[in-house]
């Protein structure tokens, strides 16, 4: 199934970026938020992203070294068309407090909430009875594994991870990680969605906290500490256990 309606749960730094990028790429996007206070914190992020995208496109038109692959391909770049897509994304992106209303016709729900296990479980338990049969759920969690939450979604076969890097309009990678009950069909659909929002989809077939990129980064940090002779200051053995767990 090709997705049209996307709901992002959470309007933090990455949640707002994911929502704006999907809207920029033509999807109908709603950000579900828990309170009026959340709207007050999220709207300025959306305002800032609009300006960031405009500035990035202007720089791309002047300097190929400033290219943002999440915004356009070099061989088909049209500055005015890209700027129009930014305006459309900003105008059409919706913020919603009513969860039932937000997900009523959702093809994909992207959970991008704080890394708190209890809060995520409560969210999934509230979400589950409200979803249409068609809806696929993904989590953007960077440290908590999808298998921890699959049973609370009510649709473990349609649940997996979709993890983004910060500044996704230029760092355009998306790591797609399954858990034991994920159906291959929905893995493929989410891979396609990642491509549709101009991400490079990186399949992760085994659950791993940190996914691919963070795991690689952690190893590099560890080696750098060794090279700089900082073993004693950072208690290297303890750090090693933490990084590779």
Language-model-detected regions and their locations in the chain:
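Rossmann-fold dinucleotide-binding core
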Residues: 136-215
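Substrate-binding/catalytic subdomain of NAD(P)-dependent oxidoreductase enzymes
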Residues: 177, 203-245
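Rossmann-like NAD(P)-binding element
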Residues: 34, 40-41, 52-136, 144
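Structural signal for hydrophobic packing residues in well-ordered secondary-structure cores
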Residues: 43-57, 110, 131, 153, ...
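Short amphipathic alpha-helical segments
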Residues: 19-20, 43-44, 121-123, 149-151
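NAD(P)+-binding Rossmann beta1-loop-alpha1 motif at the extreme N-terminus of oxidoreductases
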Residues: 1-68, 130, 179
């Amino acid at each position: 199934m090709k997705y049209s309606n996307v709901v992002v749960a959470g309007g933090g730094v990455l949640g707002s970026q994911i929502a704006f990028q999907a809207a920029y790429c033509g999807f109908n996007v709603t950000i579900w938020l828990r309170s009026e206070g959340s709207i007050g914190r999220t709207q300025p992020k959306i305002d800032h992203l609009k300006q960031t995208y405009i500035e990035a496109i202007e720089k791309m038109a002047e300097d190929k070294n400033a290219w943002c692959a999440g915004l356009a391909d070099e061989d088909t770049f049209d500055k005015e068309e890209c700027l129009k897509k930014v305006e459309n994304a900003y105008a059409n992106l919706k913020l919603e407090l009513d969860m039932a209303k937000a997900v009523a016709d959702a093809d994909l729900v992207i959970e991008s909430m704080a890394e708190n296990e209890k809060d995520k479980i409560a969210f999934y338990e509230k979400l589950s009875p409200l979803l249409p049969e068609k809806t696929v759920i993904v989590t953007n969690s960077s440290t908590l594994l999808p298998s921890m939450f699959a049973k609370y979604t009510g649709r473990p076969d349609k649940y997996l991870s979709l993890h983004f890097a910060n500044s996704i309009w230029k760092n355009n990678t998306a790591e797609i990680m399954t858990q034991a009950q994920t159906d291959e069909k929905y893995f493929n659909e989410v891979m396609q969605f990642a491509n549709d929002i101009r991400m490079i989809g990186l399949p992760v077939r085994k659950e791993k906290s940190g996914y691919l990129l963070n795991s690689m980064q952690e190893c590099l940090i560890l080696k750098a500490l060794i090279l700089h002779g900082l073993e004693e200051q950072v208690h290297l053995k303890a750090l090693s256990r933490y990084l590779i767990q």
